[in-house]
Each structure stands twice: as C-alpha cells, then as structure tokens.
Amino acid sequence: MKYWIFKYPFILKLFLNLFPPLFFSGIKITYISQDFHRFQIKLRNWPGTRNANGSQFGGSLFSMSDAVYGTILMAILGDKYYVWDKKSVINFKHPGFGAVYLEGVITPLFIREIIEHTKNGEKYFPTVFATVHDKKGNEIATVSRTLYVRLKLSLIHITEPTRQ
C-alpha cells in the first residue's frame, strides 16, 4: 500500500470513502482525528442497505468496522508493521432503522501494548470493541475484531551472541 495515504487524516478519510467495498455499501467515514486515534463512521439509510423488514442489513452493520480498524492502526504504527483482520464477531441487539453510527477509539495504551508485544517479531492478536448506535444513542450492535499485528521481519534487530 502507498504510505502517503496515511500521512494526513483527510487523505485517509478520502481514500476510505472512495474504497469501493465501503462506498457501495453506503458506509462513510465522517471523522478521523489528527492523531488517527478517534474516528466516526456512518451507515446511511438507503434501499441498498435495508433488509426485508426495512431495518439496516446485518452485513452492512458488520461492514462498518471492516478494514477500518486495521487501516487506522496502519496509519498510527506506520509501515513497520503488518496489520490484518483475523477474526470478527457481531452481536445484534436491536434492529437499526435509519442511519446508524460507529465511533472508534484507539488508545495510546493499546498502541504501547502492541509495540511491546511485537518488538521481537512476535505475532500479536489484540482485540478492539465498538458499538453501533442510532442517532438517538440506542445500541444496535456490538462488534469485536481481533487483529493480527507483527513487526516486519526486516526490521527486527536480532543480536547474535559473541563467541570468544
């Protein structure tokens, strides 16, 4: 991936909003903070995202967090790390009628834990949690995503013991 995309939040936001899987699903990134640690996502209400009951399609709700957490984490960590989605779980609480929202936060402590667990090239599988809510604040679903994070092997400094 071209790392100039991660240089400024507005460039990443534009890139994600034009990314076909999100764009054609009615998903829009509405905000990314200057330090990339906070972001907001909106799933618009239109016929392409509604199910037979008129509420938001579960797959669209699930897609709100897909690719975004990993991509935001890549922006924070830089090009020294591999970041992929490994596993994801959604728990539907209530039907979502109308536009729904997800607000994500990646804390400095979370980043420090990743750096500590991966400093020698180990794989690390942190989990992030998010809540999807409607405009009244009602909880529609909760999502957990387990990520795969690893320092790129070419950047690991392995020291060989000296022989005497």
Q: How does the language model describe each region?
A:
Residues S25, H37-F39, W84-S88, G98-L102, ...:
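A generic structural signal for short beta-strands and their flanking turns/coil linkers
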Residues I72-L109:
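Hydrophobic beta-strand-centered segment that forms part of the acyl-chain substrate-binding groove
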